[in-house]
Swiss-Prot record:
This is Cytochrome b. Heme 1 (or BL or b562) is low-potential and absorbs at about 562 nm, and heme 2 (or BH or b566) is high-potential and absorbs at about 566 nm. One of its GO terms (molecular function) is metal ion binding. Belongs to the cytochrome b family. The keyword Membrane applies. Heme b b566 binds at residues 97, 196. The gene is MT-CYB. Heme b b562 binds at residues 83, 182. The keyword Chaperone does not apply. It is a multi-pass membrane protein. Its cofactor is heme b. Component of the ubiquinol-cytochrome c reductase complex (complex III or cytochrome b-c1 complex) that is part of the mitochondrial respiratory chain. The b-c1 complex mediates electron transfer from ubiquinol to cytochrome c. Contributes to the generation of a proton gradient across the mitochondrial membrane that is then used for ATP synthesis. CDD domains: cytochrome_b_C, Cytochrome_b_N. The cytochrome bc1 complex contains 11 subunits: 3 respiratory subunits (MT-CYB, CYC1 and UQCRFS1), 2 core proteins (UQCRC1 and UQCRC2) and 6 low-molecular weight proteins (UQCRH/QCR6, UQCRB/QCR7, UQCRQ/QCR8, UQCR10/QCR9, UQCR11/QCR10 and a cleavage product of UQCRFS1). This cytochrome bc1 complex then forms a dimer. It comes from Planigale gilesi (Flat-skulled marsupial mouse).
Length: 381
């Protein structure tokens, strides 16, 4: 009798994706984050669904409905804390996942990489509209500041901003539509994840050496299912530690106050995972220039495959490129720190220098490091 998982039309898809999938034998723990992102997505959809059952998307009751969830709903505090901190874990895994792709040259699978960038943008959009829903001070003013950036677009900007708001300012209509967007986007993300995996399984996974691994493959199960389970254990442990012991440590204290359009907080800032882009936005004194820099900081990922100049795929054997990569990582951490500071010296100049270095590293220094490696390989030692 033939095995059901190899004959049943539905089981066959699961089998080819997670059980009998030929995987490179040498992929490291950095390859765990793809599956962890899948788990994060499931956690966010489930906790979000239960929150949506009790949340009301009205300016008068949104804030109190979130308080009601935490006080009166059975384990509502836990669901809310898991959802809020789950977003932080999601972005942590996401940035590591992108960083791994950048380091090991996975971006040369262009379709997979491009869908990944679209996924990143969609997740960022989802997180932004989700942050507005509790209708606290930072929710309201964050929504006002970021959506107001649309008005920087010449000619159609103001009309576009008012179209998004559903009025002349962020109000009831904005909150209602943001809730609708926040509900539908995770399902769009799920569809994009399937497309992402479809393209990945066309070429197969990359590996740390960057060499074609076709001659040495092992089945995904049990080797990588066990490895992923270990990663999952660490993820859940970290998430539960965050959600149970310090659930508000990554949030903003201003969000404990209900939204008040007449009182502007002294320092408007988004969640920590957007601070690097926010710092780049603020580093340019011109509104339109800042918006373009903000977009470029993310969309630059789309041109990375065309900036690859080295003969070797991975950075594993390219020490100069490795050094630049870790400088870029440190630079992004610096930008994240600057994004959370007040707009005053010395933070302004640090932010401007870090923003210049960010684009300089990706557009100029890293391609030059690849060419330098090619030149060194050609020398007869």
């Amino acid at each position: 009798m033939t095995n059901l998982r190899k004959t049943h039309p539905l089981m066959k898809i699961i089998n080819h994706s997670f059980i009998d999938l030929p995987a490179p034998s040498n992929i490291s723990a950095w390859w765990n984050f793809g599956s962890l992102l899948g788990i994060c997505l499931v956690i966010q959809i489930l906790t979000g669904l239960f929150l949506a059952m009790h949340y009301t998307s009205d300016t008068l009751t949104a804030f109190s409905s979130v308080a009601h969830i935490c006080r009166d709903v059975n384990y509502g505090w836990l669901i809310r804390n898991l959802h809020a901190n789950g977003a932080s874990m999601f972005f942590m895994c996401l940035y590591i996942h992108v960083g791994r792709g950048f380091y090991y040259g996975s971006y040369l699978n262009k379709e997979t990489w491009n869908i990944g960038v679209i996924l990143l943008l969609t997740v960022m959009a989802t997180a932004f509209v989700g942050y507005v829903l509790p209708w606290g001070q930072m929710s309201f003013w964050g929504a006002t500041v970021i959506t107001n950036l649309l008005s920087a677009i010449p000619y159609i900007g103001t009309t576009l901003a008012e179209w998004i708001w559903g009025g002349f300012a962020v109000d009831k209509a904005t909150l209602t539509r943001f809730f609708a967007f926040h509900f539908i986007l995770p399902f769009i993300i799920t569809a994009l994840v399937i497309v992402h995996l479809l393209f990945l399984h066309e070429t197969g996974s990359n590996n740390p050496s960057g060499i074609n691994p076709d001659s040495d493959k092992i089945p995904f199960h049990p080797y990588y299912t066990i490895k992923d389970a270990l990663g999952l254990m660490f993820l859940l442990l970290t998430l539960l530690m965050l959600a149970l012991f310090s659930p508000d440590s990554l949030g903003d204290p201003d969000n404990f106050s209900p939204a008040n359009p007449l009182n502007t907080p002294p320092h408007i800032k988004p969640e920590w995972y957007f601070l690097f882009a926010y710092a780049i936005l603020r580093s340019i004194p011109n509104k339109l220039g800042g918006v373009l820099a903000l977009l470029a900081s993310i969309l630059i990922l789309l041109i990375i495959p065309f900036l690859h100049t080295a003969n070797q795929r991975s950075m594993m054997f390219r020490p100069v490129s490795q050094t630049l990569f870790w400088i870029l990582t440190a630079n992004l951490i610096t930008l994240t720190w600057i994004g959370g500071q007040l707009v005053e010296q010395p933070f302004i100049i640090i932010g401007q220098l870090a923003s210049i270095l960010y684009f300089l590293l990706i557009l100029v220094l890293m391609p030059l490091a690849g060419l330098f490696k090619n030149y060194m390989l050609k020398l007869k030692w």
